From Swiss-Prot:
The lineage of its organism: Bacteria, Pseudomonadati, Pseudomonadota, Gammaproteobacteria, Pseudomonadales. GO terms for molecular function: structural constituent of ribosome; tRNA binding. One of its GO terms (biological process) is translation. The gene is rpsJ. InterPro entries: Ribosomal_uS10, Ribosomal_uS10_CS, Ribosomal_uS10_dom, Ribosomal_uS10_dom_sf. This is Small ribosomal subunit protein uS10.
């Protein structure tokens, strides 16, 4: 597994959860002897929704809502068998989406 690289992409609505999960992954990887590149903050996606408050008239009365999706990227270079086992056993927060790719 010395020539492989593990790329981890994290997505979450709450930046505190994603930063905490990223720190857990980095600590786990470094403890098992792997090199870590990152965390690299990727652009935050902002989705805005406008909703009419009034059911019939007053088109000017509106509410605006926003959902922010925060993203982070981690590269684990030269992972060992211990690194892969430790990452599989790692329990992350429920609000964090994790995508792992080997390359």
């Amino acid at each position: 597994m010395q020539s492989q690289k593990i790329r981890i992409r994290l997505k979450a609505f709450d930046y505190r959860l994603i930063d905490q999960s990223t720190q857990e992954i980095v600590d786990t990887a470094k403890r098992t002897g792997a090199q870590v590149r990152g965390p690299i903050p990727l652009p935050t996606r902002k989705e805005k929704y406008t909703v009419l408050i009034s059911p019939h008239v007053n088109k000017d009365a509106r509410d605006q809502y926003e959902i922010r999706t925060h993203k982070r990227l981690l590269d684990i270079v030269e992972p060992t068998e211990k690194t892969v086992d430790a990452l599989m056993k790692l329990d992350l927060a429920a609000g964090v989406d994790v995508q792992i790719s080997l390359g």
